């Protein structure tokens, strides 16, 4: 297995892997995400490629000048539980470290306990921050979240539950 920047011939396979792994959402275009990552100077899509030149895993890594970020870490289902996810994260950390960025982070949906456990096992910890977002495209009408603040946001900001 070798880890290297994703070759163009495997772009479609990477998008399929992300879809098969449940990483895509209707409001995010994974093909556009991939194109932006590989064409930007501050990001890259890394690939684990097998001896048969097939795609085994991916991770999108980049930085904003202050923090490194990881997205789309996906391992082919037939390759899971063999240490490949850990190897991909180590490659992402090396990529970020080589750019003298002092911190790397990622986002995981709170309901995805298995994935949270994977990252905790690698030494990652909850940063105890609230991530807020706003759509700037035509997809802003998609209901991304309930209209009331989540329990976690209410707790963090010490806002009482309006339903109570």
PLM ranges: what are they?
Residues 1-2:
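Extreme N-terminal starter segment of soluble prokaryotic enzymes
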């Amino acid at each position: 297995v070798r880890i290297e920047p994703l070759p163009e011939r495997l772009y479609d396979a990477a998008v399929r892997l992300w879809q098969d792994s449940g990483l895509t959402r209707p409001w995010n275009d994974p093909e556009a995400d991939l194109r932006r990552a590989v064409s930007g100077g501050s990001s890259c899509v890394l690939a684990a490629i097998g001896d048969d030149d097939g795609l085994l895993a991916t991770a999108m890594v980049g930085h904003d000048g202050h923090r490194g970020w990881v997205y789309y870490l996906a391992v082919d289902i037939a390759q899971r539980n063999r240490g490949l996810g850990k190897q991909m994260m180590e490659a992402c950390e090396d990529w970020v470290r080589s750019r003298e960025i002092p911190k790397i982070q990622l986002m995981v949906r709170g309901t995805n306990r298995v994935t949270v456990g994977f990252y905790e096992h690698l030494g990652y910890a909850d940063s105890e921050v609230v991530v807020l977002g706003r759509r700037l495209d035509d997809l802003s009408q998609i209901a991304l979240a309930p209209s009331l603040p989540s329990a976690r946001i209410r707790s963090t900001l010490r806002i009482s539950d309006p339903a109570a």
